[in-house]
Amino acid sequence: LAISYISLINHINSLGEKYQHSDRMILNVTDESHIITANPLLAKFLVKGSKMWRKLGIWLWLATQNMDDFPNEAAKLLSMVEWWELLNVSASEIDEINRFRKLSEAQKTMLLSAKKSDRKYTEGVVLATNMEALFRVVPPSLFLALGMTEKHEKAERRQLMMQHGYSELDAALEVAARIDKARGIA
């Protein structure tokens, strides 16, 4: 994993150098990033890279579902993060975030105020140097239906496929129509 990731990062770095005079930014997005930062060599590599990448127009985005999965070795990297986008976090997750970014009581209160309503919306908080804001994401029903990966959600689509002879897309469209109806917009 380390060799593959370093190769990928080196390629992204080469693209940044090649296009450094372009006004187009490069986003380096790593999902499940706690897996990468658990390797002390990779964490140090990303710290060094991300300091240089700002000059090349490369922005490092790290995503994870669980802050407690980040090892202490990731502290230096996470302390450099300029923008934190936090979706519907719990009190225990706030403690984990506080390991890497000191939060004020007002910020903790704002984080705890973010809510989630299944199949409707998710609220979150943006924390940056010059901005703190509560936001709500209301995805279109089709996006929700296509993104449903829980076992019972997949079983619902499978049942529609079997019952009506639908393709997977047709089943997702049916689920989306049901979500629209439940939202009162159909």
What feature does the model see in each segment?
Residues 1-18, 22, 85, 117-186:
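Conserved P-loop NTPase motor module
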Residues 1-110, 141:
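Conserved P-loop NTPase motor cores
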Residues 95-116, 120-131:
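Electropositive, surface-exposed helix/loop patches at the edges of structured domains
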